[in-house]
């Protein structure tokens, strides 16, 4: 897939190509992270760029999306490890980053607006917003192919602190996302 895109970009003299990657490509511990790492190496070899993003807040297939659908179906919630932390970005911020960096060739672009959330706070916020019975949830436990927190590409070079969202912040964000996404689909 990646090689085909690079071949076509070269054939049609595409000025820059930005491949979407993930923070899971830094010190990868599973197949997904390793495949993204290898894709990054190939893209950079051809002098194109990488957008090494973090989790998109409430993207399709994300933990929030899965939990939301389980709650709406009145199913049990499955949780891996409440002690995990994840970095997130809003889709609007990601789009801004991509547009603002379209001319930056042969570079790894990292998100400019990110925030950190503890999985326990995310879980508690969602069940509060949706009034879900916590007795219908269970913890699977930590899995070997997951990290407690991902490593960012420029972790050592951050010149700003990454805000950590508390439950109040998360509840506001969940309510806004529900209003913008799910209500607008009705």
What spans do the regions from the language model cover?
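Strand-loop microenvironment adjacent to phosphate/nucleotide-handling motifs in alpha/beta enzyme folds
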Residues: 11, 41-43, 47-50, 55, ...
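Conserved Rossmann-fold NAD(P)-dependent oxidoreductase catalytic core, especially the SDR/UDP-sugar
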Residues: 2-37, 48-49
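Residues at alpha-helix caps and immediate loop-helix transition turns in enzyme cores, especially N-
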Residues: 1, 30-31, 63, 122
């Amino acid at each position: 897939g990646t090689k085909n895109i690079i071949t076509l970009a070269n054939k049609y003299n595409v000025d820059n190509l930005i491949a979407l990657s993930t923070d899971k490509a830094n010190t990868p511990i599973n197949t997904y992270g390793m495949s993204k790492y290898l894709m990054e190496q190939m893209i950079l070899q051809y002098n194109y760029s990488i957008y090494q993003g973090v989790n998109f807040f409430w993207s399709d297939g994300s933990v929030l999306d899965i939990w939301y659908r389980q709650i709406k179906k009145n199913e049990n919630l499955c949780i891996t490890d409440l002690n995990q932390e994840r970095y997130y970005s809003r889709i609007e911020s990601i789009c801004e980053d991509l547009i603002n960096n379209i001319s930056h060739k042969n570079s790894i672009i990292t998100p400019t607006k990110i925030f950190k959330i503890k999985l326990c706070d995310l879980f508690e916020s969602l069940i509060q917003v949706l009034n879900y019975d916590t007795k219908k949830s269970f913890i699977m436990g930590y899995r070997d192919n997951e990290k407690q927190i991902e490593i960012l590409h420029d972790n050592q070079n951050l010149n700003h602190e990454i805000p950590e969202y508390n439950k109040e912040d998360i509840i506001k964000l969940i309510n806004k996302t529900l209003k913008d996404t799910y209500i607008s689909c009705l």
